[in-house]
Amino acid sequence: MPGLPDQPVTAGDLLTLEELGDFRRASTLRGAGLVLHAWGTIGAAVALYVCWPSALTLTAAVVVIGTRQLGLVVLMHETAHWLLFPSARLNTWVGTWLCAAPVAVDLREYRRSHHQHHRHTRQPQDPDLPLSTPLPLSRPRLALALLGDLSGWTALTRIVGWRPRRHGIAPAWRRCRAPLIANAVLFGVLTAIGGWTLYPLAWALPWATWYQLVTRVRNIAEHGMLPSVDDPLRNTRTIRAGLLARAVVAPYWVNYHLEHHLLVFVPCWKLRRVHALLLRKDLGPRMECAASYAAVIGQATSANGPARA
């Protein structure tokens, strides 16, 4: 099929009504499988450290668990769009208690803010704009930011900088009630498995370090150094991710971000098919596709052009 005109692309330009229905359809089985995979991977990493405690297994657990904590955020993002399950109630319950609360995120607030992000991507009204600006940075400044993530400094500043009085005590309690309950449950479970030190080592430490790092890398990669235009092929980036990148940086197809912005109603596990569809329709030259996460980080420390695949 010849390439589409050089103008913003819509779902109707790409899909028939039958294809739209197929791409839009969520699956309870697939949604449950993804949540079970995230928590199963976390459990396996915890078991590795408990059975063979050492600096090496702890480091591996921190990386694996920190990445799956980002994975929980990715799955929470799916529930924010009502895409993880066909049931709205199930999306909200699972999104709140099994995805958002364990990593100290409020699903209701995220859903409200994230829909604004989609309406105003890379525009002044975009609430996520500060996450990908100002870029590019000098190598020392970006290295310092990444070191702050790995050292736990970023997490500490976020915790210390949170002020209940900004929103009032009652709203603040509503925001942190679910995270407190979820983490109390995690503390109890991990304490029963390996003693009270297991929670700080196997949950808080990954969250305070590797999770912060991969979250920053994700934010830079998805929208950093891109123009403020109303075209998801140009204001959002997809990143090629091999097996290693998917294991430690980009879980659950989060690297297909352009495809998500273009067809926001498509569940994450179908985004790879959307990517293939765009290439078949000769849209590849118009798409912002980076060769790797390393390539995007390299671009973030230079004034060079886009890190295209």
Regions found by a protein language model. Name each.
Residues 64-65, 69, 204-213:
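Small-residue-enriched core segments of transmembrane alpha-helices in multipass membrane transport
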Residues 213-246:
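Membrane-interfacial segments at transmembrane helix termini in multi-pass membrane proteins
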Residues 72-81, 110-122, 218-225, 250-266:
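Histidine-centered catalytic micro-motifs
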